[in-house]
């Protein structure tokens, strides 16, 4: 998605060699110029549209593919970005930005070795380019770190961070005046104090943070992979989508819709962290409410509650900056126990991403998923976190490069087989904060307004009433936040403007 303000801006490139000026090629250049203007205005969808039209007229121009690849990167369509970058290189092996684009796409997909190969190519061609060297060195560090982690994982049985913690011996210093758990328990007073403390940009004491993490892990690991909830006719529940570290917008949700309680239950549908630079504040607030109301405050896993995403998009860096690497490891353990889906009254299924790459998946199949792991590259767990709907029937290759895209016929068949009415998912920015697709059978909700301080989108949350379960949408807009830019803790390669 769009980068934070203040980062090095990478603009769509203008072709160096003007093609022959016949009518078709001239029109392609005009379309490319229009696309560049949309790109500069951060209207990436229209930029993609006009680059695509230029490509139709002149499919042999590598720069058109390179430019569209960058626009796809901005809209998180990493699979499409990878394809365009590869095509640009095929057309012109000397087109260096094609290698940059492909490396960025592979980085976004967690394919660090493939990214390193492309950075290595750039360094060989431009050995004196400091920027290229820096990107190569940073990517090389990640590859070595991943290799080290794999070696450790293969040499010993997995040991929980909890086993190495001695929370009781942690001392809360006299000068700390912030919120503390009461007799080791989260209370409503603690939660109100915590939100105000965070609003004032202060840090929760590490002992309290560890207490919350250890306790919420105990709660989550007892849950089913598919949480099943019954609403009485007079009861309602609020469903929120991605919040992505936008803490002040989370506070606004509670201001507009009321604090969580036993009579005001919530479901937060994944992607609590990354991108926004208040992810620690968001996730500890959500975990606190989960401890306070374990049966009325629900958290589902998103594709950003995973190590690969956290390493790139900021959460790992943020936890290390505000606390320690050990605490990040504990967050990672806790994320692995987050449920993957929730079913309301046996009729509405909620998951972060969407439906499946293969037919015939049942609710019982979801229940049987062993979720306590990093997600695989394919299969039902991957699909629940990563897939997206598409308007045409059938399935197609994912624009993200992970999982699939599924059409209205796929949704209809899944719902009929499992006796469901519709699904609610998140995972995608929507200009109005929500979208109803597939004939009302596939609803998207997104709760991070003006995503990354750049997209200008509204956000929304959904009310479901037990009496009819029809989604009632409530839109809201972004509120001011302190001058800490999104992606402030993201991987150095992101901060260098490569994504």
From Swiss-Prot:
Designated gene of the protein: Ppp5c
Residue numbers annotated as active site: 304
Required for autoinhibition: annotated segments: 495-499
Keyword annotations of the record: Acetylation, Cell membrane, Cytoplasm, Hydrolase, Magnesium, Manganese, Membrane, Metal-binding, Nucleus, Protein phosphatase, Repeat, TPR repeat
Organism listed in the record: Mus musculus
Maturation and modification: Activated by at least two different proteolytic cleavages producing a 56 kDa and a 50 kDa form.
GO cellular component, one term: plasma membrane
Pfam families, alphabetized: Metallophos, PPP5, TPR_1
Names of the cofactor(s): Mg(2+); Mn(2+)
Protein name from the UniProt record: Serine/threonine-protein phosphatase 5
Gene deletion effect: Animals are fertile with a growth rate equivalent to that of wild-type. Males weigh less, exhibit reduced fasting glycaemia and improved glucose tolerance, but retain normal insulin sensitivity.
Enzyme class: hydrolase
Chain residues that bind substrate: 244, 275, 303-304, 400, 427
Catalytic activity: O-phospho-L-seryl-[protein] + H2O = L-seryl-[protein] + phosphate; O-phospho-L-threonyl-[protein] + H2O = L-threonyl-[protein] + phosphate
Gene Ontology molecular function, alphabetical: ADP binding; ATP binding; G-protein alpha-subunit binding; Hsp70 protein binding; Hsp90 protein binding; identical protein binding; metal ion binding; microtubule binding
Cofactor note: Binds 2 Mg(2+) or Mn(2+) cations per subunit.
Region (Disordered): 1-24
Location in or out of the cell: Nucleus; Cytoplasm; Cell membrane
Similarity comment text for this entry: Belongs to the PPP phosphatase family. PP-5 (PP-T) subfamily.
Positions of Mn(2+) 1 binding: 242, 244, 271
Residues holding Mn(2+) 2: 271, 303, 352, 427
Modified residues (N-acetylalanine): 2
Organismal lineage: Eukaryota, Metazoa, Chordata, Craniata, Vertebrata
TPR repeats by residue range: 28-61, 62-95, 96-129
Region called Catalytic, residue ranges: 184-499
A biological process from GO: negative regulation of MAPK cascade
Activity regulation info: Autoinhibited. In the autoinhibited state, the TPR domain interacts with the catalytic region and prevents substrate access to the catalytic pocket. Allosterically activated by various polyunsaturated fatty acids, free long-chain fatty-acids and long-chain fatty acyl-CoA esters, arachidonic acid being the most effective activator. HSP90A and probably RAC1, GNA12 and GNA13 can also release the autoinhibition by the TPR repeat. Activation by RAC1, GNA12 and GNA13 is synergistic with the one produced by fatty acids binding. Inhibited by okadaic acid.
EC number: 3.1.3.16
